[in-house]
Design a protein with these regions (language model features):
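Low-acidity, Ser/Thr- and Arg-rich intrinsically disordered low-complexity segments
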Residues: 3-21
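Short, linear, compositionally biased motifs with a strong N-terminal bias
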Residues: 12-13, 31-32, 282
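Short, low-complexity, charge-dense intrinsically disordered segments
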Residues: 26-27
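Tandem repeat scaffolds
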Residues: 31-114
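Short, helix-capping/interhelical loops that line the mouth of catalytic, cofactor-
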Residues: 107-133, 181-229, 289-293
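Alpha-helical packing segments of well-folded alpha/beta enzyme cores
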Residues: 133-140, 144, 173-176, 217, ...
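Long, well-ordered alpha-helical segments
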Residues: 143-151
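Short, contiguous alpha-helical
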Residues: 153-208, 230, 247-293
Length: 293
C-alpha cells in the first residue's frame, strides 16, 4: 500500500502485526479478531494481522510490538507509558506529540525546513503564495524523473516495502489532480484518466476509474503528468485572492470527491501537498532501487 496522504478513518491497516505475550506458559495460538476486550489476558501468539479494526480505548500492557508494522492508523489521544522506542521509524501527520514531556512537533518542523528550505513556501494562504509554491513543485520534480529514467524500466514498476512503485506514484498524482482540480475546480463531469490510481484504501466506485493492475510505460504516464501539471499551472497563474477564498461549484455527476462545494484553497493545497510528499517518498525509494539495479 502506498497512500502516504493523511490517515482516514476507513483506511485499511493491512500489514499491521501485533505480537502479544504474557508471562504465563502456553501453546502458541494465532490471535483472532475482533480485538480483545480491555483487560483480557492473551497467551503468546504468532504474528497476525488486524485489518480495519477499532481499538479505541483498548489497553495494551506488557506487550511486545517489536518489528510490528502499522500503516494508515490513528493514534489520536493515545498514551504510551514505560515505552521502549529503539530503532523506530515513524512517518505521518503529527500534532501535539510529546515525548518525555517535550512537544517534538516544532523540533521536527524546524529540522524539515532546514533540510528543505523551500518547504516553508508550501503552506500558502494567498494567490501569490500559491504561485510560489507551484513554482517549487515544478522545479523539484524534473530531477526526480531524470533519476528514475536511469533505472531499468522493470524497476519502475517495483514496490519498496509495500509502497507504491515510481509509476504508481505518478499515476496517483494524476488521480489527485483529476479529482481536486479537473473535477472539483473545473467542474468537468468526466475528469478522470483510466490510468489514474486512487489511494489503496479507497472504497470501490464505478464512476472513478481505478486499475491497480495496469502497467503503463513511464512515457505514457509522463505524458499525462505533463498535461495535468500544465492545467494546475494555468489555474494558479491567473488565481486571485477572491477566487482562492471562494468555493467550487458542485458537480452533480457521481465521482470523487463527492458532489458538493469545496474551498478552492483546500483543493489546491491538497494537490501541492500530494506533489511534495510523494516526490520525497519517490526519492527515498529510488535510492533503494538504485542499489538493486
Amino acid at each position: 500500500m502506498a497512500a502516504r496522504n493523511r490517515p482516514r478513518r476507513s483506511a485499511s491497516t493491512a500489514g499491521t502485526s501485533f505480537i502479544i505475550w504474557t508471562d504465563e506458559p502456553a501453546d502458541r495460538e494465532e490471535l483472532t479478531t475482533p480485538a480483545p476486550d480491555v483487560g483480557t489476558r492473551w497467551q503468546a501468539g504468532r504474528v497476525t494481522e488486524f485489518v480495519k479494526q477499532d481499538f479505541t480505548g483498548a489497553r495494551f500492557e506488557q506487550v511486545d510490538f517489536s518489528r510490528a508494522w502499522f500503516r494508515n492508523v490513528y493514534f489520536t489521544g493515545a498514551t504510551l507509558r514505560g515505552a521502549w522506542l529503539e530503532d523506530v521509524d515513524i512517518d505521518g501527520e503529527i500534532r501535539n506529540v510529546r515525548i518525555n514531556g517535550v512537544d517534538i512537533v516544532p523540533l521536527v518542523e524546524a529540522e524539515l525546513n532546514r533540510r528543505y528550505p523551500e518547504r516553508a513556501k508550501l503552506d500558502p494562504a494567498d494567490a501569490d503564495g500559491f504561485r510560489e509554491a507551484w513554482t517549487v513543485i515544478e522545479r523539484v520534480w524534473p530531477p526526480t524523473v531524470e533519476r528514475a529514467k536511469r533505472l531499468p524500466p522493470e524497476l519502475l514498476h517495483e514496490r519498496v516495502e509495500g509502497e507504491w512503485s515510481f509509476i504508481e506514484t505518478l499515476r496517483h498524482l494524476v488521480s489527485a489532480t483529476d479529482a481536486w482540480v479537473r473535477r472539483a475546480i473545473l467542474g468537468l463531469s468526466e475528469p478522470y484518466s483510466p490510468l489514474g490510481l486512487r489511494h489503496d484504501e479507497a472504497e470501490p466506485d464505478p464512476s472513478v476509474p481505478n486499475d491497480p493492475d495496469a502497467r503503463p510505460s513511464l512515457d505514457e504516464v509522463l505524458e499525462l503528468r505533463t498535461d495535468r501539471m500544465h492545467t494546475v499551472h494555468e489555474i494558479i497563474a491567473t488565481l486571485t485572492d477572491d477566487v482562492l477564498a471562494g468555493q467550487t461549484d458542485p458537480v452533480p455527476a457521481p465521482g470523487y470527491p463527492p458532489a458538493g462545494s469545496y474551498p478552492v484553497l483546500r483543493c489546491l493545497r491538497t494537490v501541492i501537498n500530494e506533489e511534495w510528499l510523494h516526490r520525497l517518498y519517490a526519492e527515498r525509494d529510488l535510492a533503494i532501487l538504485e542499489r538493486r539495479g
